[in-house]
From Swiss-Prot:
It comes from Clostridium perfringens (strain 13 / Type A). Signal peptide: none annotated. Keywords: Cytoplasm, Phosphoprotein. Covalent carrier of the coenzyme of citrate lyase. NCBIfam families: citD (TIGR01608), PRK13253.1 (NF009726). Belongs to the CitD family. It is found in: Cytoplasm. Its main location: cytoplasm. This is Citrate lyase acyl carrier protein. The keyword Coiled coil does not apply. The lineage of its organism: Bacteria, Bacillati, Bacillota, Clostridia, Eubacteriales. The keyword Phosphoprotein applies. InterPro entries: CitD, Mal_deCO2ase/Cit_lyase_ACP.
Amino acid sequence: MEIKKPALAGTLESSDCIVSVEPSMDNTIEINLTSTVKKQFGNEIIKVAKETLKNLGVNSVVMEINDKGALNCVIEARIEAAVCRASEINEFDWGNYKCQD
């Protein structure tokens, strides 16, 4: 999926996160994380983000994640929503999408 415009998904409520994505000028994946649990779970959050981007076919993006203790499934869902919005797609074939284990 190609990121065409900036987009957001999520909230700053407890146990949620807000994810923003925008096109990368240098065709790389850049993930910036701010989290209340970064010391304990920062590496896992980054891993989930990278795997979700890979599953969506995103090869170039600047992503900001502001996490307030969200579970992995919430992080994945917020990334999916932000990427779909930024890609300006109207329909997505969820039947062929591989979710995180």
